[in-house]
Amino acid sequence: MKKLESTLVNMVGVLVAVALIMGGILAFVNHVTEGPIKQQAEKTLADGIKAVMMSDNLTVTANDTIKENIEGKECTFIVHKAVDAQGNELGAAVESTTLGFGGDLKVLVGFNPKGDVLGYTLLAHAETPGLGAKADTWFQKDGKASIIGKNPASPLTVSKDGGDVDAITASTITSRAFLKAVNQAYNVYVKKNNTDANSGATTQAGVKK
């Protein structure tokens, strides 16, 4: 009986030791990879801002997080305001997320000071690979239903809903979600501009991306 108890104690001791070692290894790996992952995410965003603002020579002057209640749900937007090398306002790149066919669809949309769409890129999505790839090109300048240059003051909608934007073939849900993200990004951008104007906010130089 004592031998059995001793064996059980040894087994428990070994399991605890293994668990502690594995926990330590996982913590170390997380610590080692956390920095590079964060740096890569920041680089991806910085490159995305340049792409959607159509400028390699810009300075991001503000990164404002804005929360809006949309259809009873709190949604988070991030507005990245930018200026050119001479300090002239370029507009802003806005991060916007909506629910697509497979899950969240996160879009980065660039607007000029008038609110016209300069460019866009998908930051993340849970659509099938084919739909995600199509959404990233379908609405581009050389795509089949370009939104570049359009102003969402009149909300962008697909043809099936009475709009003038052709939906991705066999993917109306993803198209609606994408355009909704763009429309919401525009509304937040305009609201932010109005708030800044009313408060007398001025642009200050930031860190060049």
How does the language model describe each region?
Residues K2-K209:
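Flexible, solvent-exposed loop/hinge segments and secondary-structure transition points
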